[in-house]
């Protein structure tokens, strides 16, 4: 089964998405997501100029060989642009292979390991009362795992805040220049335990409670914070400190039993190796679009399972519905599954990407259609051209550039 076509589409039905479409001589079509928030055109160019021409004429069934060819053959290995492009190719080829087999991808991977995929939602608010109201809404929807973020008194901007009540959180801003946001670690550390106390006092411990620190703390600050919130029994604290220096997680681990989740910015198993091998984290948050697709994620998950580290894949709506569809198939199969992030998509986005997944009482299922179970409406996508947008930049109150 030969590859006869490979096309790249950049569309913005509310968010910029990079879509790869691979076509075979049998007429089968595979879809992959190559979206890299704020750097979409870099990945699109990498695909168009380098990978797509080298796909033509290859056997679509030889997924592993193609993966290795693009990874090892590039010499300049890893990195978010390279790995996002490889991820899209890999997803599309698995989509084709499952369609050729006439089965949903999760069956091809080895079948379901569970009845459904537990997903966690995002709750947000500028005050604790706003968060409690949003939490109640998501609890009523059936979510069993809920992330909470709240505006911090005295700070004009706080990570995770939506631009209005009832709106989804959207960090990127349109235009050619990123928004600059202020950050105060001291105010955050003083306030955030009060948020968890309010949530647990009102709703109890029925739901899993998650929180994202978004790389903002130093190791010793993260250790102190993790210790201070143990009574609230968080499912995890996410990205407590930048993970470039992975040894620093030993300090955090030595001081708290609050579970740690890391990895959304990782793009290969080598980024995860030390954290997993030394059991410095509990959940690995690598994502289908940035860590090598199905093939890359399988390697990471298999390695993590040796150390009882579970998956908790990154899944915001700045990754396209194609990524989410692939993630659900992977999550349904992978033995050491933990939870899957799910922010939801607008109707406009889902019109461009018709899907077969379902949500019921806090769990999702990818559906039974062959392949990934998702489509791409090219004509409709063409109505939504690329619209430049960038993630924010953070500064401390004295003007020092900080980790966003």
Curated annotation (Swiss-Prot):
Is the Magnesium keyword given for this protein? Answer: yes
Functional description taken from the UniProt entry: Has low D-mannonate dehydratase activity (in vitro), suggesting that this is not a physiological substrate and that it has no significant role in D-mannonate degradation in vivo. Has no detectable activity with a panel of 70 other acid sugars (in vitro).
The record ties this protein, via NCBIfam families, to:
ManoateDhtManD, PRK15072.1
Single GO MF descriptor: mannonate dehydratase activity
Family the UniProt entry places it in: Belongs to the mandelate racemase/muconate lactonizing enzyme family. GalD subfamily.
Listed Pfam families: MR_MLE_C, MR_MLE_N
Question: What cofactor does this protein call for?
Answer: Mg(2+)
Annotated catalytic residues: 159 (proton donor/acceptor), 214 (proton donor/acceptor)
Q: Name its GO BP terms in alphabetical order.
A: amino acid catabolic process; carbohydrate catabolic process
Q: Where do the annotations place substrate binding? A: 37, 122, 264, 285, 314, 318, 341
Q: Which InterPro entries match?
A: D-mannonate_dehydratase-like, D-mannonate_dehydratase_GalD, DgoD-like, Enolase-like_C_sf, Enolase-like_N, Enolase_C-like, Mandel_Rmase/mucon_lact_enz_CS, Mandelate_racemase_C
- Free-text comment on the cofactor: Binds 1 Mg(2+) ion per subunit.
Name of the molecule in the record: D-galactonate dehydratase family member Ent638_1932
Query: What keywords would UniProt list here?
Result: Lyase, Magnesium, Metal-binding
Main EC class the enzyme belongs to: lyase
């Amino acid at each position: 089964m030969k590859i006869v076509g490979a096309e790249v589409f950049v569309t913005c039905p509310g968010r910029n998405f990079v879509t790869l479409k691979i076509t075979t001589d049998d007429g089968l079509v595979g879809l992959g997501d190559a979206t890299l928030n704020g750097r979409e055109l870099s990945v699109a160019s990498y695909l168009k100029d380098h990978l797509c021409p080298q796909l033509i004429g290859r056997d679509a069934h030889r997924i592993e060989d193609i993966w290795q060819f693009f990874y090892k053959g590039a010499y300049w290995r890893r990195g978010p642009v390279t790995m996002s492009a490889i991820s899209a190719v890999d997803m599309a080829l698995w989509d084709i292979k499952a369609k050729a087999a006439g089965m949903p991808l999760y069956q091809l991977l080895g079948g379901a390991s569970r009845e459904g995929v537990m997903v966690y939602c995002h709750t947000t608010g500028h005050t604790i009362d706003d968060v409690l109201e949003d939490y109640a809404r998501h609890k009523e929807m059936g979510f069993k795992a809920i992330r909470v973020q709240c505006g911090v008194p005295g700070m004009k901007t706080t990570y995770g805040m939506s631009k209005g009540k009832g709106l989804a959180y959207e960090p990127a801003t349109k235009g050619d220049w990123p928004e600059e946001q202020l950050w105060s670690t001291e105010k955050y550390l003083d306030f955030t335990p009060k948020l968890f106390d309010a949530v647990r006092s009102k709703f109890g411990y029925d739901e899993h409670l998650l929180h994202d620190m978004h790389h903002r703390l130093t190791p010793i600050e993260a250790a102190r914070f993790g210790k201070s919130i143990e009574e609230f029994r968080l499912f995890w604290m996410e990205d407590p400190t930048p993970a470039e220096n992975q040894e620093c997680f030993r300090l955090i681990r030595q001081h708290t039993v609050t579970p740690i989740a890391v990895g959304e910015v990782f793009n290969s198993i080598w980024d995860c190796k030390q954290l997993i091998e030394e059991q410095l984290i509990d959940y690995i948050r690598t994502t289908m679009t940035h860590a090598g697709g199905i093939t890359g994620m399988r390697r990471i998950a298999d390695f993590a399972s040796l150390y009882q580290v579970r998956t908790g894949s990154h899944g915001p709506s700045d990754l396209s519905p194609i990524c989410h569809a692939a993630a659900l198939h992977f999550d349904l199969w992978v033995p050491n599954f933990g939870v899957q992030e799910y922010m939801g998509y607008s109707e406009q986005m889902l019109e461009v990407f018709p899907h077969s997944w379902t949500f019921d009482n806090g769990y999702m299922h990818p559906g039974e259609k062959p392949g990934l179970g998702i489509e791409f409406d090219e004509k409709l996508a063409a109505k939504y051209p690329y619209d430049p947008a960038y993630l924010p930049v953070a500064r401390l109150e004295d003007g020092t550039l900080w980790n966003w």
